[in-house]
Amino acid sequence: MAYRGRFSPTNPEKYKGDPTNIVYRSSWEFRFFRFIDAHPDVIWWQSEEVAIPYLSPIDNKIHRYFPDVIMKKRVGLDKYETLMIEIKPKRQTRPPDISKKNNTPTGRISTRYLREVKTYGINEAKWNAAKKYCDDRGWRFAVITEDELGI
């Protein structure tokens, strides 16, 4: 999924922010950007334009989370919804498999397991902060994985 570049929208007037400075950090983000840029029910959208503070469970410090997408879409006649969306692999949206914890010949905790615990803990902290941010504004937060993208 290491795929990165600048996205040039077909409908730059729909983008809230600088439409010449839209960066995608994965092929999945690129695919989603193309979809929402072209979709007639998407009124506006932005990518990584909002910073949400969150407390990291790793170092107990405040960091900033930049959600992949915030968008406003039409959901009915004169009815709209604002969504904050994070695009992630499904494996990063679930707690690590505890059965793989001691997956080394010496029985020590594996580096991979520790990395997965760290990633999941940080993601969970970011997403809890994002949910609160959205709740305070009447928005909805969603994590989109390869399942929703049809990959």
Predicted segment positions?
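Electrostatic, structured charged patches in enzyme active sites and in nucleic-acid/phosphate-binding
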Residues: 1-151
